[in-house]
Design a protein with these regions (language model features):
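FAD-site-proximal beta/loop scaffold in flavoenzymes
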Residues: 237, 242-259, 353-405, 409-412, ...
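Non-catalytic, surface beta->alpha helical segment in thiol-disulfide oxidoreductase systems
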Residues: 76-108
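Short active-site neighborhood of thiol/selenol oxidoreductases, capturing the structured segment around
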Residues: 14-26
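Thiol-based oxidoreductase modules, predominantly thioredoxin-like and allied folds used
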Residues: 3-4, 23, 35-42, 46-61
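Structural micro-motif
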Residues: 60, 66-75
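Glycine-rich dinucleotide-binding loop and its adjacent helix/turn
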Residues: 109-118, 122, 231-284, 377-379
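Beta1-alpha1 glycine-rich phosphate/pyrophosphate-binding loop at the start
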Residues: 120-192, 275-301, 308, 316, ...
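A Rossmann-like FAD-binding core segment of flavoenzymes
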Residues: 182, 186-214, 219-222, 282-380, ...
Length: 422
């Protein structure tokens, strides 16, 4: 694998052969999560396909020329021609493999797959998810001498790692960068001795057998499972959103705001995330138009007051997006006034969406008792409806979802499990 610059693009990528190019950024958790997958697959496919990386921030002109609008972005080339699908954002290992396989003959793909040998490992407790709840559970279990493995499709930290600042975590007088707070949580749990398997694809989850398969070949078994899978951003489901996701529409200000210096953006939403991230984006963008469906923000008072004082931010209350489209290098957002029913087109360089979250339960939706919103029901010890399975953090049914409440959930589950196992 090789790091290149735009001056080497022609000789390293376009000169011939099969190449996969990773555009990455700093302070980008999805980039950090895809890096070990990229490196691991380079060892597996490296004899047939060249793996190269390019730092997007220092090669902006080429990135824009190639249509790269989000980090990370993987592009695939065959004899100088871009082929396969472009991958962006939270990229799965299986998605990369699918595109790599499309570049090679079927027989060669079979030979490569034959090199992968299945493995099995066993633990006392398996934690699914490395956000604050999962990390806290891992720390308490480790300190109780319980053999624990922590699994996550991304790197540790959860949403905290992409939060610009955390101002209400006890013990810190000044606001803390989210990435630093999550890093410290992760390091504390790791140094205690908890085993980490992160930035992996979770291929299969069997709650009855207490068994999880990662990256299609590694089976991990445990006596107890803690579900700490958290939540994911809601999509609006309007025309053009899916097509422009990662190509002008972003759900991560920490990852992409830096690329909108002196540019105009649209921010969708009105809760804490939307208001706080809009303020962060204004450090880079020259103008922000916020679109919110209600007549007032639902964010906390301090965040609202700070936003209203920001001269870069214009607000459209009681409006909703109806479609997104690309016109040249611009994104056109059509919004509808919910009172007058008139529609307006907003032309910008990019769009950021923060309209709430949904629980990550797809792989065990039918196995556990859920509330009407799809969140997992638990008892006071964080036990779910299935014996031996616990749940903590934002994925569970509760009134408030904060870093501190996730930490409390993880603490309770870990103590309950440690007592039961011992």
């Amino acid at each position: 694998m090789k790091e290149i610059t735009s001056s080497e693009f022609e000789t390293e990528v376009l000169a011939g052969g099969k190449v996969v190019l990773d555009f990455y950024s700093t302070e980008c958790p999805p980039c950090e999560a895809v890096a070990p997958k990229f490196e691991g697959l380079a060892k597996l496919y490296g004899k047939d396909i060249k793996f190269v990386k390019m730092f997007r921030q220092q090669n902006k002109e080429l990135a824009e020329k190639l249509g790269v609008k989000s980090s990370p972005t993987l592009l695939f080339f065959d004899n100088g021609v871009q082929v396969a699908h472009t991958l962006t954002g939270g990229i799965k290992r299986s998605d990369i493999i699918h595109e790599l396989d499309s570049l090679l003959p079927t027989e060669r793909v079979k030979e490569i797959k034959a090199l992968i040998k299945p493995t099995v490992s066993e633990f006392d407790v398996l934690i699914l998810g490395a956000g604050p709840g999962g990390l806290t559970a891992g720390l308490y279990l480790c300190q109780s001498k319980v053999n624990t493995v922590l699994i996550d499709i991304a790197l540790p930290g959860g949403h905290v790692s992409t939060t610009h600042e955390v101002s209400n975590y006890p013990g810190f007088i000044d606001p803390q960068p989210g990435y630093l707070l999550s890093h410290n949580m992760s390091e504390q749990t790791k140094l205690c001795g908890t085993i980490y398997k992160v930035a992996v694809d979770v291929t299969k989850i069997d709650l009855e057998k207490k068994e999880v398969v990662v990256d299609e070949f590694e089976t991990i078994r445990a006596k107890k499972i803690i579900i700490a899978t958290g939540t994911s951003p809601n999509l609006m489901g309007v025309p053009g959103e899916k097509e422009l996701k990662g190509k002008g529409i972003s759900y991560c200000a920490t990852c992409d705001a830096k690329y909108y210096g002196d540019k105009e953006v649209v921010v969708i939403g009105g809760g804490n995330s939307a208001v706080e991230e809009a303020d962060f984006i204004s450090r880079f963008a020259s103008k922000i138009t916020m679109v919110h469906q209600f007549d007032a923000f639902t964010a906390n008072k301090q965040a609202r007051e700070k936003l209203f004082e920001n001269p870069k931010i214009n607000i459209l209350f009681e409006n909703e997006p109806r479609s997104f489209a690309r016109e040249g290098d611009k994104i056109v957002t059509e919004v509808e006034d919910l009172k007058t029913k008139t529609k307006t087109k907003l032309t910008s360089d990019g769009v950021f969406v923060f309209i709430g979250m949904k629980p990550n339960i797809a792989m065990f939706r039918d196995k556990l008792e859920l509330d009407s919103w799809g969140y997992i029901k638990t008892d006071e010890d964080m036990r779910t409806s299935m014996p031996g399975v616990y749940a903590v953090g934002d994925v569970i049914s509760k009134k408030y979802r904060q870093i501190t409440t996730a930490v409390a959930d993880g603490t309770i589950a870990a103590i309950a499990i440690a007592k039961e196992l011992n």
